[in-house]
A protein has these predicted regions:
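Intrinsically disordered, low-complexity regulatory regions
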Residues: 1-93
Length: 93
């Protein structure tokens, strides 16, 4: 059973890395640029946006008309913002 969980962790982390790299190529480092411009509060705001979306999807069971983002996609984005925040703060040391 442990190997199954470990494999799923590897798969999720690999997917996260792929998505982050793909978006970084597509949009540039907009996350860091926005944080530089508006401060560290941006780090929390991005994460809070995803938490609010999860609340609507999981607790309130609201659907977003026209949006294709699933609960799983939202969790992946949340993890992505956490990773980007970590990198941003490390680079500011």
């Amino acid at each position: 059973m442990q190997n199954v969980v470990e494999n799923k962790i590897d798969e999720a982390c690999n997917e996260l890395a792929r998505v982050l790299k793909e978006k970084n190529k597509k949009y540039g480092d907009s996350f860091s640029k926005t944080a530089d411009e508006y401060g560290n509060a941006v780090l929390l705001l991005r994460i809070q946006d995803k938490l609010n979306r999860l609340k609507k999807l999981l607790i309130l069971k609201e659907n977003f008309s026209g949006l294709e983002e699933s609960v799983e996609d939202t969790f992946l984005d949340l993890a992505g913002y956490a990773v980007l925040s970590k990198i941003y703060l490390e680079n500011k040391k």
